[in-house]
Amino acid sequence: TVTCERRQVNRVYVSNKTMADGVEYIKVSAIGSQNDWSAFSEIWDSLPSKNTRAVILDLRGNGGGLIDAALKMANVMTPVKDAELAGVRYRDDMGGLEQTYSTGNALPLNKIVVLVDGGTASAAELLAGSLQDTGSATLIGSKTYGKGQGQFHIDLVNGDKLVITTLELELPKQGCWEGVGLTPDIQLENRKVTVNTKDLKPLDTSTTLRFGDSSDAVYAMTERLSLLGLLTEATGRYDGNVADAVASF
């Protein structure tokens, strides 16, 4: 005999991993509840203790979720105070346009990179697009899905479903992206790369690298740039191709 107890399961869709000294990878596969915001906030607040200087935020395959949770994530990553993050436009009889502005309390990071693809939609696009429009992050990947509207679903007695559009999401520069999607700053198609990080040369972040340098430190940096698709291969010389890759990152 098996006794089953029914209870609510609150799955968390946020995880993280330290990729290298000073570089944190955060995967948000959905923004399904406030638990995901809480998990993200806990990870984010831990970054100073790790001396984090760059963050890779992976939103690939994220179909969206809660708008307010996405805006909270965008806020803590936006360094400029009072920057318009996004607007939610309801019907006039439901309140009209509601705009959200940043508080300017973001961590002093050198870089935030957001990974997106065709599976990035809705609230995840809101998060990515807000960071892109405010200049807080660089988007890398392929064009996103293009869902910038919210709907209310009503089940009818005959089994049909009535879908009513109740809101439209708007970015400060790009406006509503419904049916259009977001275009990444650096366009790359998804690819699978299996890497044993133990095989990578240690990255010495205390060393200042300059154009023309040849060293193991340059090679270690270009190993990581090549994994991101910004270089075709690693090299020990800081040449023009490396400079372009660094500028793109």
Question: Language-model features: where?
Answer:
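Short acidic, glycine/serine/threonine-rich helix-capping segments at coil-helix boundaries
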Residues: 208-219, 223-249
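Long, charged amphipathic helices and adjacent flexible linkers at domain junctions
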Residues: 10-13, 206-211
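BRCT (BRCA1 C-terminal) domain core and associated BRCT-interaction motifs
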Residues: 139-140, 144-162, 167-172, 242
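Cleft-lining beta-strand/loop regions that shape enzyme active-site pockets
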Residues: 2-147, 151-153
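A short, sequence-level motif marking secondary-structure junctions
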Residues: 3-9, 167-169, 184-185
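Active-site lining segments that contact anionic ligands and/or coordinate catalytic metals
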Residues: 109, 134, 157-164, 183, ...
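Primarily N-terminal secretory
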Residues: 171-207, 216
